[in-house]
Amino acid sequence: MIGLSEIELAGIAGAYFLGSLSSAIIVCRLMGLGDPRQEGSGNPGATNVKRLYGSKPAAITLLGDMLKGVVPVALANMAGWSPLAIILVGFASFIGHLYPIFFGFRGGKGVATMLGVMFGLSLPIGAAVAGTWLFVAKVLKISSLSALIATALAPLYIYLLADGNMAWVSVTAIMTLILFWRHRSNIERLLKGEEDLIKKQPGASDPKE
């Protein structure tokens, strides 16, 4: 397959299965909480978990989702795999998070896992994307918009910080398009001025993300 070795293909498949381990569902089960797919927005991600159950399970969920992107990509990087194989490992983990085989192919929206992939590619790339995410979130206080802007800029950051590695740029651009598609309801609310702010009043329950 397009010049990939058997071990690289196996690694890509393994990354998909790793990505399919839904941090939100697993964390909530271990902590005796509800199923985030059945409550709030129905999205098994850190934002919904935070709104439903608080900061601690949300932080663990966020870390777990990021590690699903960081670990396989960093390992492929350290193993000296081809640039295409490295980014396809990240893509597979990202797709696993969105469409997990272990949870009925109903996964999250992919922001944290994509951010983890960026850190796995290189620390400067990850820092650039994360920095953009945090800066926009602080200024605009809209979680979905900060994620969309940060991931939209990810291909540009890779081009500038990875010597124009077009395999990484191209696959990351595809990931960004998929992520935008997964956020289409958020985008509709943004255009209507109805999207939730990050900081909500205690007890508020407008589960839209």
UniProtKB/Swiss-Prot annotation:
Pathway annotation from the record: Lipid metabolism; phospholipid metabolism
GO CC terms, sorted: plasma membrane
InterPro entries: G3P_acylTferase_PlsY
Pfam family, any one: G3P_acyltransf
NCBIfam families: glycerol-3-phosphate 1-O-acyltransferase PlsY (TIGR00023)
Quaternary structure (record): Probably interacts with PlsX.
Function: Catalyzes the transfer of an acyl group from acyl-phosphate (acyl-PO(4)) to glycerol-3-phosphate (G3P) to form lysophosphatidic acid (LPA). This enzyme utilizes acyl-phosphate as fatty acyl donor, but not acyl-CoA or acyl-ACP.
Listed name of the protein: Glycerol-3-phosphate acyltransferase
Protein species of origin: Hydrogenovibrio crunogenus (strain DSM 25203 / XCL-2)
